[in-house]
């Protein structure tokens, strides 16, 4: 079992806004986008380790996080990018979460429905925010894969051989 620490800072931010009485759907949406940007800014090392495990391990790997949609969603998008999947397919795959994810928000049922929707589902703008951060920090996804995640041509070929069917 591998643990890759990626701390979800969004929870503390949401609680702070709630305590100030300022938690609205637009605020929640922006906090979610900022959380995704921070995956790139502060957690590239953890995502690099994920790819290390994908390349080294022989057993199947399960990738998950608390809700199974945000950190896992970004990790899955990175894996698909590394495998050469077209961006529009990656975006469609990410948004399938909203169709198949059964969220349990009973612990935060006192929040307005639009805020619950913002934090309990995925939004294309969340993934866009992460890849905008990739663009700002690395120029493009290919450079992020190569320089940030240390996936050169040999590693990408090995991933494709291991995880794609002919």
Could you describe each region identified by the protein language model?
Residues 67, 71-72:
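Ser/Thr-glycine-rich phosphate-binding loops at phosphate-binding pockets of nucleotides
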């Amino acid at each position: 079992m591998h643990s890759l620490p990626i701390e979800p800072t969004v929870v503390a931010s949401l609680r702070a806004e709630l305590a100030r009485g300022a938690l609205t759907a637009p605020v929640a949406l922006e906090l979610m986008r900022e959380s995704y940007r921070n995956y790139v800014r502060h957690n590239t090392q953890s995502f690099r380790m994920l790819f290390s495990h994908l390349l080294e391990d022989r057993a199947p790997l399960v990738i998950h996080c608390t809700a199974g949609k945000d950190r896992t969603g970004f990790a899955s998008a990175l894996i698909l990018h590394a495998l050469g999947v077209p961006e529009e397919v990656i975006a469609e795959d990410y948004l399938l979460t909203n169709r198949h994810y059964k969220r349990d928000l009973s612990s935060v049922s006192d929040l307005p429905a639009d805020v619950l929707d913002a934090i309990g589902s995925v939004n294309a703008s969340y993934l866009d925010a992460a890849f905008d951060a990739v663009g700002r920090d690395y120029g493009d996804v290919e450079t992020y894969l190569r320089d940030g995640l240390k996936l050169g041509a040999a590693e990408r070929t090995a991933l494709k051989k291991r995880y794609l069917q002919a």
